[in-house]
């Protein structure tokens, strides 16, 4: 187990593991201000490469989060759904798995995509949009927690990404045998991005 500390505005932590030994990202925790710690774990000693991307997140007059790239161009806002995000970064997205879940425990969305990047890497990521509702209180205009998770892959191959819709309890009318839901509903999904030209 290792704790990796870094400083970033709104981080996307990714890792490259070519050793054949599974490495799991357990958690990413804010330790104050722009300081973060990501904990990774493997069952035996292993070396990995990791990358931390810090997005420039600004809040405009409508209180929506806007993500800008290094050129100052808006890439995405917290009100965008996945089809719009795909249009904004058209040509770089090679796969997407948008989905919507309510009273649903288990694999929410899973997809695979083949890739052969031109000398770059493939980003495997997830974005949870701000339509999460907890016990009747709508959390609007925010991305909760980390923007993304996943890793880079070089060369050619197949990437698979899955997300889960967790329950928040204790009241669940559907199904009755799962008593862990605050009437939660959230949009989520995964994207595969060819970052070789970015």
What is each residue range found by the language model?
Residues 20, 33, 72, 136-137, ...:
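Intrinsic-disorder/low-complexity loop/linker signature
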Residues 140-155:
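Broad, structure-driven detector of short, well-ordered beta-strand segments within folded domains
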Residues 28-39, 152-166:
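Ser/Thr- and Asn-enriched, surface-exposed coil loops between beta-strands
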Residues 1-2, 41-135, 143, 163-198:
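Extracellular receptor-binding modules and their adjoining Ser/Thr/Gly/Asp/Asn-rich linkers
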Residues 22-28, 47-50, 124, 151:
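Generic structural motif
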